[in-house]
Amino acid sequence: AQAAVVGLSGGLDSTLAILITSVAMRLMDRPASDMIAVTMPCFGTTERTRDNAVELAERLGATLRRIDIGAAVRQHFKDIGQSMDDHDVTFENSQARERTQVLMDVATSAADWWWVPETSLSWPWAGPPTTATT
């Protein structure tokens, strides 16, 4: 696979991440379409941030993937007994962790490298996908 995967929410952190990735792709003489911008709407996604993410990916020439994580997060809440009405740290971080999981799975199947600027988790993940050896 010859791609870079970036989670794109339409917010500041992911905007900077895809802009940096775009510059890196140009420096490596790679086509913009080798950037896979993954937007993962859920409960807190606004129309504005969703539209910002889509427009930015299109303007940069990235390949855009939309993966709705709402059903997965709702199932997780059901599993752990989290109320949809309780907008606490668990509510927010469950969405962030699901996005990280989705991005890592997309990256390991499609990318040479990936970047998950997930500020809700308090640390960024970056690096090449890993593979297990037997």
Regions found by a protein language model. Give the residues of each.
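Generic beta-strand/beta-sheet core signal
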Residues: 6-9, 15-19, 38-41, 65-70, ...
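Glycine- and acidic
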Residues: 1-8, 37-39, 83-90, 134
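Alpha-helical scaffold segments in soluble metabolic enzymes
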Residues: 20, 52, 75, 102-106
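FabD-like malonyl-/acyl-CoA
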Residues: 12-24, 52, 56
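Hydrophobic (often cysteine-bearing) scaffold residues that line and stabilize catalytic clefts
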Residues: 17, 49, 99
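RNA-binding accessory domains that recognize and position tRNA/RNA substrates
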Residues: 1-5, 23-33
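Active-site adenylate/phosphate-handling loop in enzymes that bind or generate adenylated species
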Residues: 25, 60, 84-134
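A conserved beta-strand->alpha-helix junction
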Residues: 30, 34-88, 96, 122
